[in-house]
Regions:
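Flexible mid-to-C-terminal extensions adjoining Fe-S/redox cofactors in radical SAM and related proteins
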Residues: 175, 179-182, 199-200, 204-280
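Structural motif corresponding to alpha-helix initiation and N-cap regions
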Residues: 22-23, 46, 231, 235
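Structural motif
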Residues: 15-17, 81, 273
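Alpha-helix termination/capping residues and helix-transition junctions
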Residues: 31, 99-100, 235, 244
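A short helix-loop-beta-strand connector motif used in the catalytic cores of GNAT acetyltransferases and
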Residues: 188-189, 232
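Radical SAM enzyme [4Fe-4S]-AdoMet core and its adjacent flexible, acidic
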Residues: 35-36, 40-187, 193-197, 205
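Conserved Radical SAM active-site core
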Residues: 1-15, 19-32
Length: 280
């Protein structure tokens, strides 16, 4: 599959935890290097990997695999998802990446952990951070920079964010305001995902609407996908919410968190409330 889509001219982004990078896989990747590689790291020690993944040995395998992948001419980036079990490593992961793979690399953190839409062996609500810790984590890098520059007089309790009125700006004739969209993003417009059973949908998370790429063929499944989309009336609470500019909720997140496209996801709402407390 990989070789075929590469030969068709697709720009491939390869996402991996880097623990199963074998000589055979490297031989293929050297012949057909992906345009971009995203490596997921779940801790900065074997102990944390054991807590998060149940396999302490995966830590060294990740480092070894990452070193091999970094020899490719691909653009390489590192990412992580922080939950309760690896919160203690949130800064250490960034340090690990810079020490092993160079100062130019940083680590992208998942902004919000949503519930699983497919089978999962863990209860997301018991694993993910509280909204308070999640927001603080998202501001951590900025707070660390301020602390370094200000010095001993810095008090993170006094940090406030200036909030721009995005709605007001969008009403001033912005071209973005008039862009055609199905879900308010690129999903179903310039991007799609195909599931393991051949269902074409807007993204990996939003499975409420789909066409059958196996039965129809990829071209027709893509062309007819918009016809499968029938969105409900917008939630009035969300339409009138004063925190909408801060909201991380999209149709996919709503679907994952509530099981439908209309209800308010409580976790995202609480996240907004905490973020609002940091705003001027």
């Amino acid at each position: 599959i990989y070789e075929s889509i590469y030969r068709q001219g697709f720009m491939i982004s390869l996402y991996t935890n880097a623990t199963l990078v074998t000589p055979e896989i490297m031989e293929l990747l050297r012949k057909y290097p992906p345009h971009k590689i995203g490596i997921s790291i779940y801790g900065a020690s074997p102990e944390t990997y054991h807590k998060v993944c149940g396999n302490a040995a995966a830590f060294e395998k990740m480092l070894e695999g990452s070193r091999l992948l970094c020899t490719l001419p691909s653009v390489t980036e590192f990412r992580t998802t922080i939950i309760k079990d690896n919160l203690c490593d949130s800064r250490k992961i960034e340090k690990l990446v810079k020490e092993n793979f160079g100062e130019r690399h940083s680590v992208t953190q998942t902004r919000m952990v949503m519930k699983a839409v497919r089978g999962a062996c863990a209860d997301v609500e018991s694993c993910r951070l509280s909204p308070q810790d999640n927001v603080k984590l998202s501001l951590q890098k900025s707070i660390d920079i301020l602390r370094e520059r200000i010095g001993d007089g810095f008090d993170e309790n006094n940090v406030r964010i200036r909030q721009e009125n995005l709605k007001k700006n969008a009403d001033c004739g912005s071209a973005v305001n008039h862009r055609l969209s199905l879900f308010g993003c690129s999903g179903g417009m310039t991007a799609f995902a195909v599931t393991w059973e051949g269902k074409l949908q807007a993204c990996q998370t939003l499975g409420a609407f789909s066409t059958d790429a196996v039965e129809l063929g990829l071209k027709k499944a893509w062309e007819t996908f918009p016809l499968s989309v029938k969105l409900p009336e917008p939630n009035k609470k969300c339409l009138n919410c004063e925190m909408s500019d801060l909201c991380q909720s999209c149709y996919a997140l709503r679907y994952a968190e509530t099981g439908n496209l209309q209800d308010c996801p409580e976790y995202a709402c609480r996240d907004c409330e905490v973020m609002k407390s940091f705003c001027l």
